[in-house]
Design a protein with these regions (language model features):
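Extended, low-polarity transmembrane helix blocks
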Residues: 1-105, 112-192
């Protein structure tokens, strides 16, 4: 006779009990997942939306992180030099692999509702790193002397997405229309 120990990763008080709320948590989780997965697919295959040249074409063609790290980083931000220095010179660079795997992992994990703790925290860290690189609070003085500033110097889509990811993790959103229940019953608690 074997005993099964149930190890819920979400406390009963944190679970969503409303069926409508469960469905909407799943919809938001899947939509956020598709946002990450689309970014991966467009950068990997050069689908012609945000990325013209595919990463998979090899040397000299697509470099998914170089453009953002060289030109998208706010030059007035306190960490501009750090982020500019991370830009890989080759498509095979470590930062490209790390970034692309993070996008793929976030997209697949969120869409399927797998490993929500790791997926949500990892995705939030990725988004907050991009927020730091963009430094929306730092105004940019252009060559002609005009000042360019973001619409909101503190809260932008990176903050909203990060907060939403943490909320989805806390309410166990992977359990609804996802494989979260199965995942939780087959993996150690720290992997939930």
């Amino acid at each position: 006779m074997s005993a099964t120990i149930e190890r819920p990763s979400v406390d009963a008080a944190e679970q969503i009990t409303s069926t409508s709320a469960q469905k909407w948590a799943a919809v938001v989780r899947i939509l956020l997942g598709f946002t990450f997965l689309w970014a991966f697919l467009d950068k990997a295959f050069g689908l012609g939306y945000a990325t013209e040249k595919a990463w998979l074409f090899g040397a000299g063609e697509g470099n998914p992180t170089a453009g953002f790290l060289k030109f998208g980083v706010n030059p007035e931000g306190p960490m501009a030099g750090f982020f500019n220095g991370l830009a890989p010179s080759s498509p095979a660079g470590f930062m490209n692999w790390l970034f692309m795997l993070a996008l793929l992992g976030a997209g697949v994990g969120l869409i399927l509702g797998l490993a929500m703790r790791i997926t949500s925290i990892g995705s939030a860290i990725l988004l907050m790193s991009m927020w730091l690189a963009l430094a929306p609070w730092a105004k940019i003085t252009l060559e002609d002397g005009t000042i360019e500033a973001s619409n909101n110097p503190v809260v932008d889509d990176h903050i909203i997405y990060s907060a939403t990811l943490i909320l989805l993790m806390l309410v166990g959103a992977g359990r609804y229309w996802g494989l979260g229940r199965w995942w939780e019953s087959h993996t150690p608690t720290w992997l939930h």
